[in-house]
């Protein structure tokens, strides 16, 4: 399956939304939104995409698949499942990083006893959509702080030209790379033209509540 085929899978489930004013988690604005939540409704689609995500890696090369909440929970499960389908022995585990609920700077951490499965292990970090790579970078830093070896970062979509240098100098693999125009709020032409901010998708509601 080539990039066109994968993009068609995104389109078929309504995961590509255009013609509105979106605010990304990173705080940047755009007229295009990759609605990853639309993908998670379709288990067959997510399974097929995760199978593609782990193709570059040998099964025995990955001990644990890690994803940040919330989407990373689903991705880590399916990615580990498909790695285990190819393994001849042993097991690849799937765990997720949570975000602290206290304080303004909500950092990722491993709760529920998951931290014990990181040290000395080869880790594949999975993410749905990369814009700045900030969440993935935080997870990578936490994994390294616990003594894990990050083999790579694998994503469904790289929409922000995220490079290895942006995420701690690890390999970045993405099923599709989309070159989208994004803007800082102060430079956003949609804001200047008073295009209403979409409050149903993205972080528009939080942006307007500031």
Language-model-detected regions and their locations in the chain:
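Short, well-ordered alpha-helices that flank and scaffold nucleotide-derived cofactor binding pockets
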Residues: 51, 55, 77, 81-85, ...
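Short, glycine/charge-rich flexible loops or terminal/linker lids adjacent to PRPP-binding catalytic cores
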Residues: 77-124, 134
């Amino acid at each position: 399956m080539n990039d066109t085929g994968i993009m068609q899978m995104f389109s078929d489930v309504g995961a590509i939304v255009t013609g509105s004013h979106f605010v990304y988690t990173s705080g940047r604005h755009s007229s295009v939104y990759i609605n990853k939540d639309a993908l998670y409704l379709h288990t067959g689609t997510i399974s097929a995409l995760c199978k593609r995500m782990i193709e570059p890696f040998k099964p025995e090369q990955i001990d644990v698949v890690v994803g940040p909440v919330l989407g990373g929970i689903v991705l880590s499960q399916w990615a580990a499942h498909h790695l285990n389908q190819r393994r001849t022995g042993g097991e690849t585990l799937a765990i997720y990083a949570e975000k602290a609920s206290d304080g303004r700077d909500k950092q990722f951490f491993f709760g529920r006893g998951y931290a014990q499965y990181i040290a000395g292990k080869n880790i594949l970090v999975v993410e749905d959509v990369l814009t700045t790579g900030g969440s993935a970078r935080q997870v990578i830093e936490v994994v390294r702080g616990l003594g894990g070896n990050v083999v790579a970062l694998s994503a469904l979509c790289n929409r922000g030209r995220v490079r290895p240098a942006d995420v701690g100098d690890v390999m970045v693999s993405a099923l599709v790379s989309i070159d989208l125009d994004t803007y800082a709020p102060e430079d956003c032409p949609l804001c200047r033209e008073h295009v209403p901010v979409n409050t149903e998708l993205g972080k528009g509601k939080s942006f307007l509540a500031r």
